[in-house]
Amino acid sequence: MIAKGVSLRYSKALVDIATNPEQIKSHLLALEEFVGILETIPKLKELLFDPHLSTLTKKSILQRLFKDRLDETILNFLFVLIEKNRFKYIVDIRKEYHRLAKKRLGILEVRLLTAVSVSDIPQEKVRIKLQKTYQKEVEIQNVVNPDIVGGMILIMDHQIFDNSVKKRLAKLKVSLLTAKV
């Protein structure tokens, strides 16, 4: 629960200091790139997460490795995380920043769960329908889950719209079991 509160507080602060949509996008890309680098270089992650390593050493490592690669705001943000002993939450902060940035940019992220991969045409129809309904730009990520048998499940903004065959079969089963003969 602490991680959620910390990640929300710091990611919100980073979104709030952005002065325009381009800066929000730039910060998002920089955070995603940085976390990606941490994931691909375990030794670097280990060093930066090491509680025995001094703050000054960690900041020096970041400065040497990323001063030409990261925006000054992001580098300073990472320094603050190190100073406040919050760097261990960087992955959660990146996830929360991603969510807040998309929301601030008016982009609705949707996960479309289907039993088989959906071609571009049906996916585009869903995207257009959602765009008209929510008056927002829509980004769809298709996730294949054979367990749902058929139909689809839409997951967006903490809402789930389940129109899967699996759910319909479960409803049918309940109604058959509770039916009075």
UniProtKB/Swiss-Prot annotation:
InterPro entries, per the entry: ATP_synth_OSCP/delta_N_sf (IPR026015), ATPase_OSCP/dsu (IPR000711)
Cysteines engaged in disulfide bonds, as pairs: none
Cellular location(s): Cell inner membrane
Principal subcellular localization: membrane
Keywords tagged on the record: ATP synthesis, Cell inner membrane, Cell membrane, CF(1), Hydrogen ion transport, Ion transport, Membrane, Transport
UniProt membrane topology term: Peripheral membrane protein
One GO location term (cellular component): plasma membrane
Record bears the keyword RNA-binding: no
Family of the protein in this entry: Belongs to the ATPase delta chain family.
Complexes and interactors: F-type ATPases have 2 components, F(1) - the catalytic core - and F(0) - the membrane proton channel. F(1) has five subunits: alpha(3), beta(3), gamma(1), delta(1), epsilon(1). F(0) has three main subunits: a(1), b(2) and c(10-14). The alpha and beta chains form an alternating ring which encloses part of the gamma chain. F(1) is attached to F(0) by a central stalk formed by the gamma and epsilon chains, while a peripheral stalk is formed by the delta and b chains.
Name of the protein in its database record: ATP synthase subunit delta
Organism of provenance: Protochlamydia amoebophila (strain UWE25)
